[in-house]
């Protein structure tokens, strides 16, 4: 039988030199495992005389407990050292200045919406809102958009059923206000609108601001001066603004509004379309219960994302909706 004291002494030295819990676990296996050195001594007891076995077995068990205690104690010390080192590494220097919380900022579309609202609020316009789910009448019929108009097609409009849909513009808000109130009116109607379209410059949901002014003796000159003043203040430039004849079923006459956006190679102005407008069609007044013989008015509409793209130099409309903090942190 191998010398028990020698085995215990070697175990003590090995435990003292161990630098990790993994090393200690390996020592436990080497000395106390199924094939460990001390365990093997117990298996060799059968070779001894019957009279010697009890005393030898007691010594081996005592040695086994001693080595186990040494290993457990060493594990405890290592664990304490590791915990102390971890706490030291994670300690907080309370003398350092505190870190400020990361604050969010307004989304560029929200900034643009507020900028538009601010201008018209200072011009005496109220901000009106209405439901995004509309009936066919307020979204189309009351705005002089007949049943055969292309805007009613399934590929352009989200329908719930033949008479209920997601609004394609905020004009229904104007109709509802005119139905429930008496002129004069000055209002803008900001909000989300929905159309079946998706590419670099279109999304199925986008934001729109439509405006309406109704009073006695309102003329196209009033419309023009309002739009020109708004665009020059919005872009903070003395822009050239062009009104180009167009067609909208709810206004007559109607116009597309273009702004100066650089120069062509020959030095001529490069025009960029930004919004639509016109004088309110008499049939719209009739549907809303307003006397078109007494009152006249103008209306205009603009896409908020489009204006935001132009103001902030964004080329892809979809970036506004991807919630990429690398993009949003720039505003």
From Swiss-Prot:
Cofactor: Mg(2+)
The enzyme's E.C. designation: 6.1.1.20
Catalysed reactions, semicolon-separated: tRNA(Phe) + L-phenylalanine + ATP = L-phenylalanyl-tRNA(Phe) + AMP + diphosphate + H(+)
GO annotation terms (biological process): phenylalanyl-tRNA aminoacylation
Subcellular location: Cytoplasm
Keyword vocabulary terms for this entry: Aminoacyl-tRNA synthetase, ATP-binding, Cytoplasm, Ligase, Magnesium, Metal-binding, Nucleotide-binding, Protein biosynthesis
Principal subcellular localization: cytoplasm
Top class in the EC scheme: ligase
GO cellular component, one term: cytoplasm
GO molecular function, one term: ATP binding
Cofactor, how bound (note): Binds 2 magnesium ions per tetramer.
Binding residue positions for Mg(2+): 252
PANTHER family: PHENYLALANINE--TRNA LIGASE, MITOCHONDRIAL, PHENYLALANYL-TRNA SYNTHETASE
Subunit organization: Tetramer of two alpha and two beta subunits.
Family that this chain belongs to: Belongs to the class-II aminoacyl-tRNA synthetase family. Phe-tRNA synthetase alpha subunit type 1 subfamily.
HAMAP family reported in the protein's UniProt record: Phe_tRNA_synth_alpha1 (MF_00281)
Name of the molecule in the record: Phenylalanine--tRNA ligase alpha subunit
Organism: Hahella chejuensis (strain KCTC 2396)
Name of the gene encoding the protein in the UniProt record: pheS
